[in-house]
A protein has these predicted regions:
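Catalytic-loop of the protein kinase fold
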Residues: 115-131
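Conserved catalytic-loop aspartate of Hanks-type protein kinases
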Residues: 185
Length: 296
């Protein structure tokens, strides 16, 4: 059974070389053979880029499963801490200000590295930030947005199955002219900052059309009371209505460098969402590593 599911597919635990890995299955059921061939070609091209992308703040892509006609499989490193969203949702989780600053910097560093490699994310949120055993953040679910054939298919499926909530992370310009730039991901980063300090769901209870109306009218989420002034200033600049007024990820990293600890001074417990068990998922049958097989 999958231990996580999202708009792009279900995620299973598997084994590669004796190590636990994640296998994300992107369903190809119902996709015509010719279209599947085009999607596979696009997938392989981007896979090479993603495998070469190595950074402490991004999830490592290890390979791909291409032999099963019912799905495309993306093999990635397994992180035991689960998603940042999961940690924020836990009522028993005491999150210190030190960790909060640490996470804001980790996500910015991961995103800055993606853009240094000319890779857009397009779906940045705390669901797509994973935690290591010691509470470090790594950005995941990047890169596939560049696969045009695959993007068209998964976007259609996502809109059909789970459109609710998506606008909460989308920059206002995407509702107007649909022009995506780095600054669009920066807007999403601002919402991640809000999530880290509020621990709530952005625009909870509102329908997509209501969120859209607020964004176009330049309304934003209320600044969390616990948020330090320097970070609330950064957040408000990062979700500015005008994309040109938002900082780049490189600029954000420079700004955060002086106020972020190198690592948390103490770790009260291992960060673990759940304990993996043998049999959650079989080892991938064919893995090609490095090859293309509110404020009113």
């Amino acid at each position: 059974l999958p231990f996580a599911e999202g708009g792009q597919g279900a995620v299973f635990r598997g084994y590669l070389g004796g190590e636990i890995v994640c296998l994300k299955k992107i369903s190809m059921v119902g996709v015509p053979a010719l279209k599947r061939t085009k999607m596979l070609s696009s997938f392989k091209t981007e896979l090479g880029i993603m495998i070469r992308l190595r950074h402490p703040r991004t999830v490592q892509v290890l390979g791909v499963v291409t032999t099963n006609p019912t799905f495309l499989g993306l093999v990635m490193e397994y992180l035991p801490g689960g998603s940042l969203r999961h940690a924020l949702d836990r009522d028993d989780e005491v999150i210190t200000p030190e960790y909060q600053r640490f996470w804001t910097a980790d996500v910015a560093l991961g995103m800055a590295h993606l853009y240094s490699c000319k890779i857009e994310h397009r779906d940045l949120k705390t669901h797509n930030v994973l935690l290591t055993h010691d509470g470090r953040c790594k950005v995941t679910d990047f890169g596939l947005s560049r696969c045009e054939e695959l993007k068209t298919f998964t976007t259609t499926a996502t809109m059909r199955d789970s459109v609710a909530g998506t606008p909460a992370f989308m920059a206002p310009e995407l509702f107007e002219d649909n022009t995506f730039t780095e600054k669009s991901d920066v807007y999403s980063y601002a919402v991640v900052l809000w999530e880290i300090y509020d621990r709530g769901i952005p625009w909870a209870g509102l329908k997509p059309q209501q969120i859209l109306y607020k964004l176009i009218k330049e309304q934003r989420l209320d600044v969390p009371k616990s948020m330090p002034r320097d970070l609330s200033s950064l957040m408000e600049r990062a979700w500015a209505q005008d994309p040109d007024a938002r900082p780049s990820f490189a600029d954000i990293c420079k700004e955060l460098q002086a106020t972020t600890p190198r690592r948390p001074s103490s770790i009260s417990r291992p960060w673990s969402a759940s304990s993996p068990t043998a049999g959650d998922a079989p080892p991938p049958a064919s893995v090609a590593s490095g090859q293309g097989s509110s404020r009113s």
